[in-house]
Amino acid sequence: MEFRILRYDDLDRDTLYDILALRAEVFVVEQRCAYLDPDGRDKNCYHMICTENGKMKGYLRILPPGEFFKEASIGRVLVTDRRKGIATEMVRRALDFIFKELRQDTVRVEAQTYAVGLYGKFGFETVGEEFMDEGVPHIQMLYKRKS
């Protein structure tokens, strides 16, 4: 498996198409969330793609501080093959990127509640109450790296 983190301007058309198609497949079709996925933030984010033999296996987006929350954030996490550790590896690499490249020690996510365990493995803690977003239960989680 190959993992790459790219800025929006570094995405070629085919990769961008694959990202948007995969996001639509998971969030719009599977989860039946009828919302505008391209939310205007993609151009200011980093995009992690996981590929194997030229096929996209996973994706997540890294939002720099101030783009959505005051802290850096991870969102739109999805994989084509579940329960194979791909999401865990992508989150691990995203955190490493945030710590080393963005020089941030705090990360906030709005996790779908079924994914609390994924983030909990890394030390994220829930903050606030569960809420509904596009009909799907979510909760905010916060990670503060220890010095």
Walk through the language-model features, giving the residues of each.
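Conserved beta-strand in the GNAT
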Residues: 49, 55-64, 71-73, 78
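Short hydrophobic/aromatic beta-strand element in the GNAT-like acyltransferase core
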Residues: 33-36, 45-49, 59, 71, ...
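C-terminal "cap" of GNAT-fold acetyltransferases
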Residues: 112, 132-147
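Conserved acetyl-CoA-binding loop of GNAT-fold acetyltransferases
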Residues: 120-130
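Short amphipathic alpha-helix that is part of the acyltransferase structural core
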Residues: 1-44, 51-55
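Conserved acetyl-CoA-binding loop-helix of GNAT-fold acetyltransferases
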Residues: 79, 84-96
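Short acidic/glycine-enriched loop/turn segments that link adjacent beta-strands
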Residues: 42-44, 68, 133-137
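Conserved GNAT acetyl-CoA-binding A-motif
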Residues: 98-111
